[in-house]
């Protein structure tokens, strides 16, 4: 296996040389550097002490956590023997000391403790029951096969980071796959990125409730063909009940672009999409702190990270949005400038903002009829 050195953030790692990242014996995707940047920023805000990157491959995420965050004990795990051996090399490339190895587990103790583990992620998380303050699940595809075990491995007031890269099911191109994996009916079309994000958060809420756990969404977003959520667990059956009250369904009229949301454990009408999470997709206070801290860190994609966090900070936190191009096409209305629409909605007393889910979308608490009137009359 021929290796090349790569720099990302403060880390330097060896990765397999290959024509395509998908051909490499150990997976490293440089396009996910921004995903890792946002996780680094969050860990600098929340400061979890013991963290796990459950599906580590080269170890880049865990090594960056060790180098760039206050985390004190960092676990990196992969079922691949090639990945395990490469992670050990990469740890020693970034940290002084010797690895103490036994039974598929290598430990380096210095100012921080780094653990490189060779095992199935579910088996490791089952072994370390209620051990981690933060677990990051970043699989190739869906995280669902790891969710149950992660909810039992993280502390009862811990934090889960979850990435889903299977956009086709969550965006409604493969609805049966979404129903199998996420137990929800997806919505195809211009709203799919937000609906997919809310399906992902919603299934975490349902799984957590089994263990008398509620959830608080620290941040959930869509970027570069992946869905991402950071979720803090809240201990107690009552917290689980409260989280389930934030589940519901979406009704969407394809001919008009009008949508309705319904908070309910079961839908009251046919043709419902969901269940989805209808609660907040961010903690405003934490996102503001993340934006501030991101400007002080040496991130791999700093400009992109700051830009994304600024958009997320300013985004109105209400379910769904109106796509100006989609509505214009349906209603045969000429598309208007988004800032013009937002300003007019605000002048009428409604809240409104851009949304990161779509460059042509507007989030607002204005009714559909008001929005259409503004869309058609804005000058």
From Swiss-Prot:
Annotated positions binding S-adenosyl-L-methionine: 36, 61, 78, 120-121
Residue ranges constituting the Trm1 methyltransferase domain according to the UniProt record: 4-375
Domain of life: Archaea
InterPro entries, per the entry: SAM-dependent_MTases_sf, Trm1, TRM1_arc_bac, tRNA_met_Trm1_C
Alphabetical list of CDD domains matching this protein: AdoMet_MTases (cd02440)
Gene3D superfamilies hit by this protein: N2,N2-dimethylguanosine tRNA methyltransferase, C-terminal domain, Vaccinia Virus protein VP39
Molecular function, one GO term: tRNA binding
GO biological process, one term: tRNA N2-guanine methylation
Pfam families to which the protein is assigned, alphabetical: TRM
Catalysed transformations (reactions): guanosine(26) in tRNA + 2 S-adenosyl-L-methionine = N(2)-dimethylguanosine(26) in tRNA + 2 S-adenosyl-L-homocysteine + 2 H(+)
Alphabetized UniProt keyword annotations: Methyltransferase, RNA-binding, S-adenosyl-L-methionine, Transferase, tRNA processing, tRNA-binding
First-tier enzyme category under EC: transferase
EC number: 2.1.1.216
Function noted in UniProt: Dimethylates a single guanine residue at position 26 of a number of tRNAs using S-adenosyl-L-methionine as donor of the methyl groups.
PANTHER family: N 2 ,N 2 -DIMETHYLGUANOSINE TRNA METHYLTRANSFERASE, TRNA (GUANINE(26)-N(2))-DIMETHYLTRANSFERASE
Family listed: Belongs to the class I-like SAM-binding methyltransferase superfamily. Trm1 family.
Name of the featured protein: tRNA (guanine(26)-N(2))-dimethyltransferase
Source species: Pyrococcus abyssi (strain GE5 / Orsay)
């Amino acid at each position: 296996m021929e290796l090349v050195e790569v720099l990302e953030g403060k880390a330097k790692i060896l990765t397999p040389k290959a024509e395509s990242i998908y051909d490499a014996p150990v997976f490293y995707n440089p396009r996910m550097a921004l995903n890792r940047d946002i996780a680094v920023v969050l860990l600098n805000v929340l400061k979890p002490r013991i963290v796990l990157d459950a599906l580590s491959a080269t170890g880049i995420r865990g090594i960056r956590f060790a180098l760039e965050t206050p985390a004190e004990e960092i676990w990196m795990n992969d079922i691949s023997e090639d990945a395990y051996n490469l992670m050990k090399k990469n740890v020693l490339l970034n940290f002084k000391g010797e690895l103490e190895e036994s039974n598929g587990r290598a430990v380096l103790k210095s100012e921080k403790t780094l653990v490189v583990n060779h095992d199935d992620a579910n088996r490791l998380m089952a072994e370390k029951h209620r051990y981690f303050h933060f677990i990051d699940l970043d699989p190739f595809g869906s995280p669902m096969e790891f969710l149950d075990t992660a909810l039992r491995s993280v502390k009862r007031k811990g934090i889960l980071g979850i990435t889903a890269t299977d956009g086709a099911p969550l965006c409604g191109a493969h609805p049966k796959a979404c129903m199998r994996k996420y137990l929800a009916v997806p919505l195809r079309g211009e709203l799919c990125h937000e609906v997919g994000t809310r399906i992902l958060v919603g299934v975490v809420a349902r799984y957590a409730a089994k263990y008398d756990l509620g959830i608080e969404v620290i941040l959930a977003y869509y970027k570069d063909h992946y869905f991402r959520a950071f979720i803090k667990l809240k201990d107690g059956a009552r917290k689980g009940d409260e989280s389930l009250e934030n589940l519901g369904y979406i009704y969407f009229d394809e001919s008009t672009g009008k949508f309705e949301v319904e908070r309910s454990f079961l839908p009251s009408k046919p043709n419902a999409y969901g269940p989805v999470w209808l609660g907040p997709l961010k903690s405003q206070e934490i996102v503001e702190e993340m934006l501030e801290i991101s400007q002080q860190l040496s991130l791999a994609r700093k400009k992109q990270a700051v830009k994304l966090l600024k958009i997320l900070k300013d985004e109105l936190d209400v379910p769904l949005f109106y796509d100006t191009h989609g509505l214009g096409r349906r209603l045969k209305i000429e598309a208007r400038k988004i800032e013009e629409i937002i300003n007019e909605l605000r002048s009428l007393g409604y809240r409104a903002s851009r949304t990161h889910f779509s460059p042509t979308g507007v989030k607002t608490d204005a009714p559909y009829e008001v929005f259409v009137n503004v869309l058609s009359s804005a000058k």
